[in-house]
């Protein structure tokens, strides 16, 4: 379970970085050269999703919970936005959903 969760967090970081770098280029006038590491990051994201042993739909559903929590951590750490109690609650609910789905992988 820990390996799966850590893999999901790495996957989420790859996706967020792959989307954040073009955002910097489009909205913050950063260099277009950021598109190269963005593309590499998104390729890494896709590859990481293939490393899970479950059916792709289950992987995507469970990954969504970790993505929510990771995106909120990114919001706090990178963007400097203070998270509300409801943000934390939502992340907890999303992670609980991920744990429920991943627990069912063995039964399916």
From Swiss-Prot:
Localization per Swiss-Prot or TrEMBL: Cell inner membrane
Pfam families recorded: UPF0060
Membrane topology: Multi-pass membrane protein
Disulfide bond residue pairs: none
Membrane-crossing segments per the record: 6-26, 31-51, 61-81, 85-105
Keyword Cell inner membrane: yes
Keywords: Cell inner membrane, Cell membrane, Membrane, Transmembrane, Transmembrane helix
Residues making up the signal peptide according to the UniProt record: none
InterPro entries per record: UPF0060 (IPR003844)
The keyword Cell membrane is annotated on this UniProt entry: yes
Chief site of localization: membrane
GO cellular component, as recorded: plasma membrane
PANTHER family: UPF0060 MEMBRANE PROTEIN YNFA (PTHR36116:SF1)
Family the UniProt entry places it in: Belongs to the UPF0060 family.
Protein name: UPF0060 membrane protein Spro_2289
Organism: Serratia proteamaculans (strain 568)
């Amino acid at each position: 379970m820990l390996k799966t969760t850590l893999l999901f967090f790495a996957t989420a970081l790859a996706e967020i970085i792959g989307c954040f770098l073009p955002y910097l280029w489009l909205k913050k006038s950063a260099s277009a050269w950021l598109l190269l590491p963005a593309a590499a990051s998104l390729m890494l994201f896709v590859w990481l999703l293939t490393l899970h042993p479950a059916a792709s739909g289950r992987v995507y559903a469970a990954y969504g919970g970790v993505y929510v929590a990771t995106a909120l951590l990114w919001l706090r750490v990178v963007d400097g936005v203070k998270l509300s109690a409801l943000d934390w609650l939502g992340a907890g609910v999303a992670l609980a959903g991920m744990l429920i789905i991943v627990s069912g992988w063995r039964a399916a």
